[in-house]
Amino acid sequence: MNQSLLAPFGTAIERVEAGLEALRQGQGVLVVDDEDRENEGDLIFAAESLTNAQMAMLIRECSGIVCLCLPDEKVKALELPPMVENNSSQYGTAFTVSIEAKVGVTTGVSAADRVTTIKTAIADNAKPSDLARPGHVYPLRAQPGGVLTRRGHTEGTIDLMQLAGLKPAGVLCEVTNPDGTMARLPEIIAFGAEHNMPVLTIEDIVIYRKSLLANVG
């Protein structure tokens, strides 16, 4: 059903390309995962161009659990251990310990403080000692191999950033309805229309990446 509802937005390839262009322009994208999985839509921004206004939107329009998607090597470089030793969450979402910038924040909760924490973490020269633990930003470790390994929003986010030629770090939060329920695809499409954001799916990213591999082959 997801693919048929998204047909007006073009093919899977066209939807991904629209998303990549939006990210390059510093704008947000909406990514829906598989219907037999979480069946949720996440609002995603590139971490390197994230603004306070965008963070405020993530806090206001979404679940409030703002996550920073990072590749495995960055998680290791920052020495961020898993949030729990034995991950028993339904889809194995790889939360690390939460973080806060040690410098430049007050309580760490405001949009500006969360942006400062994210920019501190993704800096090329970032060190483990730059971050306090716990904090109000929740890093997620992406599986190597991206959506071809795990069809999650974490991997989809990192894949999109890399395909767009951006730093491999993205910020996401699940879109919610005004009554607090989770937004499904029809609501996600309406949200995208209201805020002029492209909508795509994890399946679209899988198709896009496989097409690139086929062309290389």
Swiss-Prot record:
| Residues annotated as site: Essential for catalytic activity | H136, E174
- Could you say which residues bind D-ribulose 5-phosphate here? R37, E38, D42, R150, R151, G152, H153, T154, E174
Cofactors, names only: Mg(2+); Mn(2+)
* Gene Ontology cellular component annotations, sorted alphabetically: cytosol
Which InterPro entries does the record cross-reference, listed alphabetically? DHBP_synth_RibB-like_a/b_dom, DHBP_synthase_RibB
Which reaction equation describes what this protein catalyses?
Answer: D-ribulose 5-phosphate = (2S)-2-hydroxy-3-oxobutyl phosphate + formate + H(+)
Per the UniProt entry, the Enzyme Commission number(s) are 4.1.99.12
Example GO BP: riboflavin biosynthetic process
- Pathway linked to the protein: Cofactor biosynthesis; riboflavin biosynthesis; 2-hydroxy-3-oxobutyl phosphate from D-ribulose 5-phosphate: step 1/1
Question: What domain of life does the native source organism fall in?
Answer: Bacteria
Under the subunit heading, UniProt states:
Homodimer.
Role: Catalyzes the conversion of D-ribulose 5-phosphate to formate and 3,4-dihydroxy-2-butanone 4-phosphate.
* PANTHER family per UniProt: 3,4-DIHYDROXY-2-BUTANONE 4-PHOSPHATE SYNTHASE, GTP CYCLOHYDROLASE II-RELATED
Q: Which family does it belong to?
A: Belongs to the DHBP synthase family.
Protein name (Swiss-Prot/TrEMBL): 3,4-dihydroxy-2-butanone 4-phosphate synthase
Give the species this sequence originates from: Shewanella sp. (strain ANA-3)
